[in-house]
Amino acid sequence: MASIDEERSLLEVEESLIQEEVKLYAEDGSIDIHGNPPLKQTTGNWKACPFIFANECCERLAYYGIAKNLITYFTNELHETNVSAARHVMTWQGTCYITPLIGALIADAYWGRYWTIACFSAIYFTGMVALTLSASVPGLKPAECIGSLCPPATMVQSTVLFSGLYLIALGTGGIKPCVSSFGADQFDKTDPSERVRKASFFNWFYFTINIGAFVSSTVLVWIQENYGWELGFLIPTVFMGLATMSFFFGTPLYRFQKPRGSPITSVCQVLVAAYRKSNLKVPEDSTDEGDANTNPWKLCTVTQVEEVKILLRLVPIWASGIIFSVLHSQIYTLFVQQGRCMKRTIGLFEIPPATLGMFDTASVLISVPIYDRVIVPLVRRFTGLAKGFTELQRMGIGLFVSVLSLTFAAIVETVRLQLARDLDLVESGDIVPLNIFWQIPQYFLMGTAGVFFFVGRIEFFYEQSPDSMRSLCSAWALLTTTLGNYLSSLIITLVAYLSGKDCWIPSDNINNGHLDYFFWLLVSLGSVNIPVFVFFSVKYTHMKV
């Protein structure tokens, strides 16, 4: 009897030791650099995050170092009109958010997130070099204006410039959908303590994005305006190289998720099988399934079907981001053009209008720590949720604040135009003596809107997407930015056409236009979007595959 008790005791001790050994390793299916289950103590978690944060910070500095002031480069250096420059910038930015679909498919189906980020970083860097050359080599950029005669870019000059820009767009397509998911992969979803840290990771990930954006909005824009575009584009190119190096330095600490096959193929199989069976009658002998048992295009697994259902439930939430992106895109285009016609001098120092974008990013740098350390613990007392607000609640708050931002922009423009009329500056197009710092609230509010909407969206699509489609769903979420930029470009084109002689957005002199009407139009679109989002959010059922 004693020997039996001893044997049971030994078995219990052995089982306890096995359980403790298992807890030493991540249990979410990830592997380390050697292909083994990753040891929690030496891989992933916050240990791996500094390298991912540094990579994202430097890459975003490079991207925004181009994007923040690109409209000024088109108008001043390439001698484009305001409308043409805005279209070029919005189309390029839209493409930067369409290419993530390519990167996501490659990551989920073939290379995994790590190698996708690595390979597309090389493409990105090549594009940065081409863009820098187009601004530095005399034969690759248009000659300076002689009086009112401004020569346009030649075919060769345009080819080099746009090749660089669209290589950057392709390169960012392999990074955008993968890096946030790759960072979240460093936290074991089966470990409750690591799940809580992952929610905080998304806040600080967005924080690091905006550190890069802040430097771009201040230092880089100032360099571009005062020291030229050669140096202004060279610095972002160097930082893109640093971003790639930082990512590789963290390799021994990373946890890797294996690619799980093409998610597009899986979705197509479900849709094709559903279509084939839509008109079929239920057979009397349910055991006679023919070749359906071996043909995935005729019979899919329950998991495949549930994954497609999840994607369909995400569509209304996804679509709400399109109008938000229309509003948010104005900080790179028409906010800048508005600021260009306002008083921008402090003594002898002239403020570049794109520099006001620093207040968009400054609001993020202020809001994220306050949200993560103050608001979340406070709200947690009332909601009982570890993360404070749900992802959908965060997104809804962001939509509302973005409308406030455009409302303030419309009011500022109304005052500016009235002042232009009072001082007889409408026809001359001279600077209106309204201080550019009146734009600060609209930039600050839009930055705060991003903290709520973008971070909520990143976390929502990561948590609610099937495991095999995480990169794809991240890219799908980013696609709303593309559609928002394209829609904004379309709205500008339609407004310019329909407003005729009384053009709301004139080619050269916005004192003679009605940019305020355009901003009020966007306020209306955003206001309609909010109740639609709330309706579908209430109906949404949270599920995991």
Curated annotation (Swiss-Prot):
This is Protein NRT1/ PTR FAMILY 8.4. It comes from Arabidopsis thaliana (Mouse-ear cress). Keywords: Membrane, Phosphoprotein, Transmembrane, Transmembrane helix, Transport. The modification Phosphothreonine is found at T116. It is found in: Membrane. Its main location: membrane. It comes from the Eukaryota. The gene is NPF8.4. Expressed in roots. GO terms for biological process: oligopeptide transport. SUPFAM superfamilies: MFS general substrate transporter. The chain crosses the membrane at residues 89-109, 117-137, 155-175, 201-221, 231-251, 315-335, 346-366, 395-415, 436-456, 475-495, 518-538. One of its GO terms (molecular function) is transmembrane transporter activity. Pfam families: PTR2. One of its GO terms (cellular component) is plant-type vacuole membrane. It is a multi-pass membrane protein. Belongs to the major facilitator superfamily. Proton-dependent oligopeptide transporter (POT/PTR) (TC 2.A.17) family.
